[in-house]
């Protein structure tokens, strides 16, 4: 109800987000500035009960067939424009992309036939992947940024999450032996019985191990996962988030996004804050000026579509102008700041003309501050953004991903 009312208010319409079983064979990305790239590799050695992302158990044969299809999808999209398109960054997610480490260079080479990457190449890794051999392979392939899914260094939380422990000494040794431009370590907060002391210990250990930045993601209980962990209460969650935020800021960190804190000012790492992006692989999403599309979650159906030289799109949303504005603002807010000049450059209309009332309310309620024309979230605003994002995730992402896990190509979905 909260997300539905918010959508109607901000879009000035009762029209829902309507996703249909349709797609454009040719994607209109040639004139998209600030374009990012995402590649999804869904294979895992074992399945974590809390993880909501598209994944499947690894087999060498299935992974090989999938990578072959993935490279063909890259060429299918990339060959639609003449010359090479300048893009910001490339990010590999999963799953466990390191299970395809020996073919990462092949994928990057295919992408570089069509795109010029200007802000580096990142990959997410399981702690078990942090070995000198794997890191050497990835660095030689062109990877410059790592995102390591630690979740927690503490055994009690590792057991809750069904994870094996990260060997701190081995982790530090491997990262020291094979350095990267950026090493982000990801943690989950708001786990059952988790205290500020627990979270502080994880953050301190991460920085000591060479992480910069550190990312703190809230635990969300998706309906379609096998997780049985209870959610933390709102007051406890806010207290924990405020405490760890103050601690990070007081110890000299900068807040580079809603989730991330960095010791070095420019050590940002995010796959989220892109104005437009192209996604390759099963479950990968694409966001362009007037549409959002998401690929099928089925590995076999994905390969079948690519074999037919067709886009593997499962659902497409055609934005109204205000829907696109809200989508832009929601994801831009992850950086904790919104610059009206960027909004006007993207949409050709002043932000205050479209959402002047909402901006005034945000300031009056203490959610945001304005300085030099730029709006920045306060500590209070950041918490309520987290809080609202939980509703958004369960109302939108949970429903969509839950459906796509069951049906390769649904007829439509209203959100």
Regions found by a protein language model. Give the residues of each.
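Short beta-strand motif preference
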Residues: 37-39, 148, 377
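Basic, amphipathic "hinge/linker" alpha-helix immediately C-terminal to the N-terminal HTH DNA-binding motif
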Residues: 321, 375-382
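A short, conserved structural fragment
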Residues: 363-373
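Canonical Radical SAM [4Fe-4S] cluster-binding loop centered on the CxxxCxxC motif
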Residues: 31-68
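Short amphipathic alpha-helical interaction segments
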Residues: 349-363
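Short, amphipathic alpha-helical interaction segments positioned at domain boundaries
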Residues: 382-415
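Flexible, acidic/Gly-rich N-terminal and inter-domain linker regions that tether
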Residues: 1-35, 45, 83-84, 365, ...
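C-terminal scaffold of the Radical SAM
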Residues: 34, 58-77, 88-349
């Amino acid at each position: 109800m909260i997300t539905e009312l918010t959508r109607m208010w901000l879009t000035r319409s009762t029209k829902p987000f309507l996703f249909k079983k349709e797609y454009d064979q040719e994607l209109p990305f040639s004139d998209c500035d600030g374009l990012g790239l995402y590649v999804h590799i869904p294979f895992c050695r074992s399945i974590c009960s809390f993880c909501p992302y598209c994944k499947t158990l690894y087999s060498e044969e299935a992974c090989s067939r999938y990578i072959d299809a993935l490279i063909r999808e890259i060429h299918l999209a990339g060959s639609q424009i003449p010359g090479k398109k300048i893009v910001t960054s490339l990010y590999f997610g999963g799953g466990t992309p390191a299970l395809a480490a020996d073919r990462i260079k092949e994928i990057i080479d295919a992408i570089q036939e069509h795109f010029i990457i200007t802000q580096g190449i990142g990959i997410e890794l399981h702690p078990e992947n942090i070995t000198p051999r794997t890191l050497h392979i990835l660095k030689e392939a062109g990877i410059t940024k790592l995102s390591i899914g630690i979740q927690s260094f503490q055994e009690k939380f590792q057991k809750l999450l069904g994870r094996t422990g990260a060997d701190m000494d081995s982790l530090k040794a491997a990262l020291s032996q094979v350095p990267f431009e950026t090493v982000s370590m990801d943690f989950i907060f708001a786990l059952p019985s988790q205290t500020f002391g627990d979270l502080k210990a994880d953050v301190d250990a991460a920085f000591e191990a060479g992480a910069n930045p550190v990312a703190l993601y809230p635990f969300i209980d998706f309906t379609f996962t096998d997780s049985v962990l209870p959610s933390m209460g709102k007051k406890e969650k806010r207290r924990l988030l405020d405490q760890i935020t103050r601690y990070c800021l007081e110890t000299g960190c900068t807040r580079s996004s809603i989730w991330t804190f960095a010791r070095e000012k420019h050590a940002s790492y995010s796959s989220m804050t892109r104005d437009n992006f192209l996604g390759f692989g099963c479950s990968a999403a694409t966001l362009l000026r007037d549409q959002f599309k998401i690929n099928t979650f089925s590995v076999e159906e994905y390969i079948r579509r690519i074999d037919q030289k067709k886009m593997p799109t499962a659902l497409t949303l055609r934005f109204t102008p205000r829907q696109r504005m809200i989508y832009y603002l929601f994801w831009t807010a992850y950086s904790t700041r919104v610059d009206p000049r960027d909004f006007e450059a993207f949409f050709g209309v002043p932000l205050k003309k479209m959402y002047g009332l909402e901006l005034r309310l945000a300031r009056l309620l203490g959610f945001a501050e304005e300085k030099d024309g730029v709006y920045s979230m306060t500590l209070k605003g950041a918490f309520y953004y987290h809080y609202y994002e939980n509703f958004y995730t369960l109302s939108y992402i949970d429903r969509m991903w839950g459906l796509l896990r069951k049906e390769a190509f649904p007829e439509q979905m209203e959100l």
